[in-house]
Every structure is written in C-alpha cells, then in structure tokens.
Amino acid sequence: MRIEKLRQAYDITTSWVHFPLHPETPAEGREMAGFYAERGLDPEAMYQRMKRLMDAEGLPYGRRTHTYNSRLAQELGKWADTQPNGEALHDALYRAYFVDARNIGDPAVLLDVVATVGLPVEDARAALDERRFKDAVDADWEKSRAYGVTGVPTFVAARQGVVGAQPYDVLVQLLDAAGAQRRG
C-alpha cells in the first residue's frame, strides 16, 4: 500500500482523521443502486472504477449491494487507536465493509470484527455503549471541514492536501513540499 511505502521512505507519523462521507445514511443502510441512481451514476461503472483503484493498491474489493453509516465504526476506530495492535482494527473494518459487505453501522458486527483481531470485546462494547469517542470523531469531522476535505481518502501534510486515490509520486511531491525528511 502507498502509505506503508511512504512510511518506509520518510520519517513521518500518520494518523486517521475521520470524515462524514454520508452521515445521513440510516443505520440499516441504503441500497447502492438507489444511492447511485440519485446521483446519476451507473452502479456497474462505479464498481469497476473502485475495483481498479483497489487492485492498483493491492487491496481486495468485493461487490457490495448496500452502503452503511460508518459513524460507530469511526468511533470504534478512535478507540482502537488507544489499544495495542489497534491498527489491525482499521484493516479489519475495511475488509468487513469493502470485501465482506457487512453492516459496519451495526454494533454487533463491529464487536465481531473486534473479536477477529483479538482486541478486548468488552472494552469495545463499553466504548460504543457509552459513546466514549463521540467527541473525538466530532473533532475529526470539524478538522476535515476546516481542511476542506470533500472525499476520501484525503492526504494532508503541512496544511496542504490531495483528495482521492493518488499515485505514489503525487504523495511524494506532497511530502517533499511539506519538508518531510527522507530516511537513509
């Protein structure tokens, strides 16, 4: 993945900043066909586009029929950032949503994903039930608005950013312009 390659080439720290891509999506989700139709987009063309992008990154990508509200998954991601090996949850949530087409707005699904990566399920349940990371996600959403984020992924370095799946060379230019130090 490009980010891993950048971490090896540069002395940088990366962090997840969550963005409200479609916060109006209900907990039970929405059918992709209707979602795309409202925007005048062809579902098959969109699937093929995303598949190509994910293939270029070496990431698996399944055929989803629904889109789901990611708010609770984002809160759980913030919780995972406080846990040893928490990064594994981000990868597992990607797989659950984009490969296995699971409803990441459903707390039971989220806790199942937590269990698959060996994080403490009861701690995760408490974090979700008590909405412990709601404010952190709210702050991320505000930060993303302040940066002018309009899509995902967005890469930001020294207050400059690029939106969308970008070639590695574009990300290198972003880091060089930000004065990031190369390794070795």
Role assignments for model-derived ranges:
Residues 1-100:
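Structural alpha/beta surface segment adjacent to cysteine/selenocysteine redox centers
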